[in-house]
């Protein structure tokens, strides 16, 4: 069989499609001929890192993905976890890094749109969103432009679609100067017996195109997302998709309405690689072939080629395998919502992916080799060198503890993110119980009197760089801890693994180490990974990002009225630290932001202590013994106390007399498995007795009183001063005054 080729397939063209010479040879061996230009594009899209996970698949298989509550693990559009009463939560996190650097508004907006589609494709109504954003250093000339565009894009799409943004992260570091990260998370609610999957079943059934029309936007987007950046980056702007949240809202309602009719056999959103990836995945999963007739595809631009139509990443589109007898019902629903509905193909029994355009066959390929049998690499990797220990007595103590604390709470990475989250609608749908700014976002489960879900997103990239294994463990542990700090039971997680070029053994070593750490922590904490995304080649001119394996998790609150908040302490409450005294200053923000050093190892994560301490805190919260709770993470005990004081507006009188160690390590050490809790005075003794009997280390620290954070003669800073420092950096940065002052 030979397909006509109007474009010569040259080594340069092959390389431009991101295919290595040995991969192209594999294509020749598979199909026994030269591929057509359209086929080359299809292979390029399906065999790149973004779609095939060819560098990471071996290691992803080692992650724990099952558990008593897991209904659907990795391999579908999103993970599904049981939350009792016949309900389930559907969630996933995914990156849109490269597009957001090139075109920040549309890149971020379509990142939100794509993750929302992943959720409602499964039959779930989205109820919460988060985003983890990482930008270059604040004084880099592009950073403010990128922050402004990304935040506007996230808010513009999410707000218009109608989903509350309940949490996330914003971090600045020079290593993201040329390659920002935009990791978008969404969660939705569905009935456990009404989950829709992408696996096609049945021969000769109609393949239906749903949603918006196809244009040229995003052609080659998946291939771009699997490449490094260089000076030609601006030329890649046409590969960024354009989103329309109002069309997506109509698509959501039409899909959920259609799903009630029994018409849907399989459904897949069109994301990376568009029509190509969705059709191949549906067929390959079901051991079926797919035939597409591109003349039936709704288009919004004239004279589109087969190549452009197959690789377009136009947004707000779905592909579905339909019960034939339900065609009229299905079409009526989509017409009602003002959306396209077109039968563009059929399922076949020959395991071929066949594409017809203008009456000619432009692609005829083995579907399994495009999908789940794509190339897989066992890349060489090198373990990171262990950093030398950094005892606290070798780290300089601050001359002025109060000024040091003010500097930390007002720094680029620890200051309030209010400027960001106030641009997001956090209250739409009317179920938000905890908003951004605390440990986790909390959303009430619609239709249930007491049940709620908690959401958190976490990673500490400087730890992962220092020690990928411990950093991977810590990302999971902090997510688990933040969910626990509300009183919720952590159920499951999704991972978004952002790394540099995996062809470099040291970068591949970071990825391998982090996955090993994530796996160990997930197993120890019964916190399985049920969905996720890998984003590699995050490099510009050979400079890689900080390794950033973001972990987003979901927890269940059986009764949200027994929930803890960071800022709900009452006057006279006693402050207790759960966990060991601070001692670890290696890779800390005190070391980085105050002393200008990145030395030292990451803190070790004792997963047994993490589990024991967290279970104790959760139990105390659910028993009504805790009025406020906050996890201790970056900045140590000092920053955690400051954040609690700012959130409540009340002072804290703290005595470190019982603590053992150097004052700066006690305050700023970033030892793990720790919380600060506020408890009523009349139950403080009871809580401490319970902790002692459970083998949980604790320290009585002081009392909620006054209007200042006063620590043991070391510092006394008014809550007003703390808030002023905490709230002022971001607005000043965005209006330019912070940079002007720094100059």
From Swiss-Prot:
Residue ranges the record marks as coiled coil: none
Keyword Ribonucleoprotein on entry: no
> What Pfam families has UniProt attached to this entry?
AIRS (PF00586), AIRS_C (PF02769), FGAR-AT_linker (PF18072)
Per its UniProt entry, what is the enzyme's top EC class, as one word? Answer: ligase
* The reaction(s) this protein catalyses: N(2)-formyl-N(1)-(5-phospho-beta-D-ribosyl)glycinamide + L-glutamine + ATP + H2O = 2-formamido-N(1)-(5-O-phospho-beta-D-ribosyl)acetamidine + L-glutamate + ADP + phosphate + H(+)
Q: Which SUPFAM superfamilies does the entry link to? A: PurM C-terminal domain-like, PurM N-terminal domain-like
Q: Which residues form the active site?
A: 50, 96
Record: residues binding substrate: 95-98, 117, 241, 313-315, 535
**Got a GO cellular component term for this one?**
cytoplasm
Where along the chain is Mg(2+) 2 bound?
Answer: 118, 269
Is this entry keyworded Glycosyltransferase? no
- Read off the CDD domains from this record: PurL_repeat1, PurL_repeat2
Entry EC no(s):
6.3.5.3
Binding residue positions for ATP: 53, 92, 495, 532
Disulfide cysteine pairs (residue numbers) = none
Q: Which NCBIfam families match?
A: FGAM_synth_II, PRK01213.1
Query: Can you tell me which family this protein belongs to?
Result: Belongs to the FGAMS family.
Name assigned to this protein:
Phosphoribosylformylglycinamidine synthase subunit PurL
């Amino acid at each position: 069989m030979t397909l006509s080729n109007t474009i010569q397939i040259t080594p340069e063209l092959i390389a431009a499609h991101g295919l290595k010479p040995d991969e192209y040879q594999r294509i020749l061996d598979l199909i026994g001929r030269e591929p057509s230009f359209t086929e080359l594009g299809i292979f390029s899209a399906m065999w790149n890192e973004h779609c095939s996970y060819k560098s990471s698949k071996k290691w992803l298989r080692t992650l724990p993905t099952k558990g008593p509550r897991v209904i659907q693990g990795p391999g579908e559009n999103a993970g599904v976890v049981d939350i009792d009463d016949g309900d389930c939560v559907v969630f996933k996190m995914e990156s849109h890094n490269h597009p957001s650097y090139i075109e920040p508004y549309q890149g971020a907006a379509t990142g939100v749109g794509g993750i929302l589609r992943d959720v409602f494709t499964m039959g779930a109504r989205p109820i919460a969103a988060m985003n983890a954003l990482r930008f270059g250093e604040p004084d880099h000339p592009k950073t403010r432009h990128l922050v402004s565009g990304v935040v506007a894009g996230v808010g513009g799409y999410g707000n218009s679609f109608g989903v509350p943004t309940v949490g996330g992260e914003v971090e600045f570091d020079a290593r993201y100067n040329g390659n920002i990260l935009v990791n978008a998370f969404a969660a939705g609610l569905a009935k456990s017996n009404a989950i829709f999957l992408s696996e096609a079943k049945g021969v000769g059934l109609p393949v239906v195109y749903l949603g918006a029309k196809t244009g040229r936007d995003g052609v080659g987007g998946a291939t771009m997302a699997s490449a490094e950046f260089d000076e030609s980056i601006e030329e890649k702007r046409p590969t960024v998709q354009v989103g329309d949240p109002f069309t997506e809202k109509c698509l959501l309602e039409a899909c959920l309405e259609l799903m009630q009719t029994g018409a849907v056999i399989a459904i897949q959103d069109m994301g990376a690689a568009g029509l190509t990836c969705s059709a191949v995945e549906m067929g390959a999963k079901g051991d079926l072939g797919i035939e597409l007739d591109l003349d039936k595809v709704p288009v919004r631009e004239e004279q589109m080629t087969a190549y452009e139509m197959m690789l377009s990443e136009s947004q707000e589109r779905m592909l579905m395998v339909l019960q034939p007898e339900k065609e009229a019902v299905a079409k009526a629903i989509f017409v009602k919502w003002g959306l396209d509905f077109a039968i563009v193909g059929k399922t076949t029994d020959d395991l071929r992916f066949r594409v017809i355009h203008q009456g000619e066959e432009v692609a005829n390929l083995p579907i399994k080799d495009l999908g789940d049998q794509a190339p897989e690499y066992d890349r060489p990797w090198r373990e990171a060198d262990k950093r030398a220990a950094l005892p606290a007595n070798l780290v300089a103590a601050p001359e002025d503890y109060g000024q040091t604390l003010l500097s930390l709470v007002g720094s680029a990475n620890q200051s309030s993110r209010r400027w960001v989250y106030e641009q997001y609608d956090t209250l739409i749908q009317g179920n938000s119980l905890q908003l951004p700014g605390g440990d986790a976002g909390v959303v009430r489960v619609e239709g249930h009197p007491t049940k709620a879900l908690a959401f958190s997103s976490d990673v500490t990239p400087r730890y992962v760089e220092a020690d990928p294994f411990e950093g991977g463990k810590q990302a999971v542990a902090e997510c688990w801890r933040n969910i626990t700090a509300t009183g919720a039971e952590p159920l499951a997680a999704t991972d978004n693994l952002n790394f540099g070029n995996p062809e470099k053994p040291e970068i591949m070593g970071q990825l391998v180490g982090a996955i090993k750490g994530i796996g160990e922590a997930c197993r120890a904490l019964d916190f399985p990974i049920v969905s996720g995304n890998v984003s590699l080649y995050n490099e510009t001119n050979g400079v890689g990002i900080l390794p950033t394996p973001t972990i987003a998790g979901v927890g269940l609150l059986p009764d949200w009225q027994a929930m803890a908040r960071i800022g709900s302490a009452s006057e006279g409450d006693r402050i207790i630290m759960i966990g060991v005294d601070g001692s670890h200053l290696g890779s800390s923000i005190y070391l980085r932001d105050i002393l200008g050093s990145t030395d030292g190892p990451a803190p070790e994560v004792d997963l047994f202590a993490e589990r024991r301490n967290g279970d104790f805190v959760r139990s105390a919260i659910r028993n009504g013994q805790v009025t406020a709770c906050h996890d201790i993470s970056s900045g140590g005990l000092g920053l955690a106390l400051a954040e609690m004081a700012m959130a409540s507006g009340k002072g804290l009188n703290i005595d470190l007399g019982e603590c053992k160690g150097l004052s700066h390590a006690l305050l700023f050490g970033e030892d793990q498995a720790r919380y600060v809790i506020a408890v009523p005075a009349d139950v403080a003794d009871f809580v401490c007795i319970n902790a002692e009997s459970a083998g949980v280390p604790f320290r009585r620290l002081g009392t909620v009183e006054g209007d200042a954070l006063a620590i043991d003669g070391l510092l006394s800073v008014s809550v007003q001063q703390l808030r002023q420092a905490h709230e002022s950096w971001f607005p000043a940065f965005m209006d330019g005054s912070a940079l002007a002052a720094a100059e």
